[in-house]
């Protein structure tokens, strides 16, 4: 759904990059990380539907708590090159065979 503001989206969704996406810790279910706002991942718990409950956004001080990650220009704590991709890789890297690589 295209949106101009949060008012254009259903409850539990927010307007991000002109799309209505699921907010962090919303009751809405997700099937992939693309359903969630940027920096938030969709996590499944057993056979339950997925929830956008894994937050990888940078803290306000810009210092990520995991030493394998750093705050990138998209304001996401992304895993550095050569690190296992337990979450999003930093901007410019992609997850290949379980490792963040260029």
UniProtKB/Swiss-Prot annotation:
Q: Name one GO molecular function term.
A: toxin activity
For this chain, the annotated S-S bridges are: none
Tell me how the protein is altered or processed after translation: Contains 8 disulfide bonds.
The free-text tissue note of the record is:
Expressed by the venom duct.
Where is it localised? Secreted
Q: One Gene Ontology cellular component annotation?
A: extracellular region
Which keywords does the record carry? Disulfide bond, Ion channel impairing toxin, Neurotoxin, Secreted, Toxin
Give the main location.
Answer: secreted
Domains as described in the record: The cysteine framework is C-C-C-C-C-C-C-C-C-C-C-C-C-C-C-C.
State the protein's purpose: Acts as a neurotoxin by inhibiting an ion channel.
Q: What protein name applies here?
A: Turripeptide OL55-like
Question: What organism does the UniProt record list as the source?
Answer: Lophiotoma acuta
